[in-house]
Amino acid sequence: MDLSIETDRMPFEGETCDGKNLLINPGGKGANQAVASSRIGAHTLIIGSIGNDAFGEDILHSLTDSGVHCDEVISTDNASTGLAIVIRTSGNNRIIIEHGANYILPSEQVIEALDRVACPGDVFLTQFECCEKTTCDAIIHAKELGLYVIVNPSPVHTIPKHVFNSIDLLCLNETECMSLFGLRAMDDFKSIDRSLSQLLANEAQTIILTVGDAGSIVVTRGQSLYQQAFRVDTVDTTSAGDTYVGAMAACVANGKSLNDAAVLASKAAALATRKIGAQRSIPTLSEIERFFEKGERDD
C-alpha cells in the first residue's frame, strides 16, 4: 500500500516540512506492474503475499478490479501488508518501503504456484520486493519451465551471477544501471549502448535502460534501439517505471516485437505521470490509443 504526500521540496536531514494532498492508494511494484500488464490487455496472474489486514484487502480489490487474477496470493497473520512511503515534489519522488508480507513469501510457495499455472512461452515478470532467495529461485524455476523471464532489479539489488543466465530481459533505470554495472546513464547513449552490448556477452539476452524523460534504449545481441520519451504534463512519476515494465511484459506476452513494445511502454509510462497516485494513474490500452492517436495530446 502507498502512503503518498506532496511537499514543495524535499526536506533536509533533520528538517520537518509541511505536506499536503495525502493519498492512500494500492501500490507495490509487483502489483503495479501486474495492473499495467492487465490494463494493456495481457492475461495476468500475480503470485504474492499480503497481510491479513485492511490494506491487504484493499490491494486485492484493486487488483481484481483491474482484471488481475489473484488465486495465488496468500494472506498471512505473520506480517503486515507491504507499505511504501512516497514523498512527491513537482513531478519527482522519493520512496521508502517496508516489505512486510512480501519478505516472508517462501520459495516453495512460488515454485508450486508456477507449476500450477505457467505454460511454456508464458512471460514471467519479477522484481526484488520479495526476499532474494525466493526471487532468485523463482527466476531459475521459471526459466526451467520454458517461460520468458523479465527481471526489474528494483529495489536496487545485486543479482547473483548464476541467476543472470536465466534472465531473458533485464529492465532497469539509471540508478539501477549505476549500482549494478557502474554505468552512468547521463553519459551519451552511444557510450551506454556499447557498454550494455558488452554486458550481453555474459548477462541477460536483452537489456532495456530507461532514463526518465530522456527516453529508453533497448539493447539486444546485434542491435539497439533508442526510444524517445513522450512529452506530457507531468504531475506524479510514482508509477511511471512500473507502468513501463508491466506494459513491456504485456506486449511481449501478446507477441509484439521489442521495438513495438518499447514504443507502447513509453506511451503508457508517460500517460501514468498525468495523475497522482500509483495504480489509479496506470492507463488502459484504449486510453493510450485515444490520447496519442486521436489528438488528445498535451502538446
Question: Could you describe each region identified by the protein language model?
Answer:
Residues 34-43, 88, 250-255:
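Alpha-helix C-terminal capping segments
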Residues 1-49, 54-65, 234-235, 299:
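Glycine-rich phosphate/adenosyl-contacting loop at the front of the ribokinase-like
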